[in-house]
């Protein structure tokens, strides 16, 4: 589904991505792990168009999308969440969700004059979708709460909900567990598993919480110094001597 081939990226002479080739299979939950500086975030930034690779390609369903801008990739169904949630703090939870679908008819001044019925129907559909998302993520009771007042874990749930508003092809989750208590992290994990099993969502996540990864992810890709060290089940990864060395050192 998503394929990265022979990818290179350097910053000031330091090679952050070194000849990476990998595939993210459709309807999988793939974890991307490795020590700080391994190149995980740089790889995400290339996939979602935030930065351009020096060479190599990124393909979605065998279509070369290398160099596409983030908004173009959004329209193709590649969505990303961040380690620090990017909510619109002065808008309510529900409004945060409703503003996600692109190219809404009501955004055009002319359409407000000439297509009021179309706008009303579209808004009803988006409202219905937002209500379904909030129900799914157990956020319905916070519909009218300003997003800036949410806890860290609730903001992560809201970000996940924003991706659900457009039925994505792949969701890139950047440390969804960072700063989240275990109860809310379990809720997030439950939602990810349901989206994967019931709606066949594809996820790729950068994550450090091994317990969380063990529950959700197969396969696990290990990165070190800008390269792929291995790709396997988490049980195999935890037993691998090279992985242990990368995380804990030779001694």
Where are these regions (language model features)?
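Conserved ABC ATPase signature
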Residues: 146-150
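The feature captures the beta-strand-to-loop junction immediately N-terminal to the Walker
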Residues: 33-35
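Walker B catalytic motif
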Residues: 175-176
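Conserved ABC transporter NBD signature motif
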Residues: 56-63, 76
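Helix-to-loop junction immediately C-terminal to a conserved catalytic motif
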Residues: 48
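Conserved ABC ATPase "signature" region
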Residues: 110-141, 193
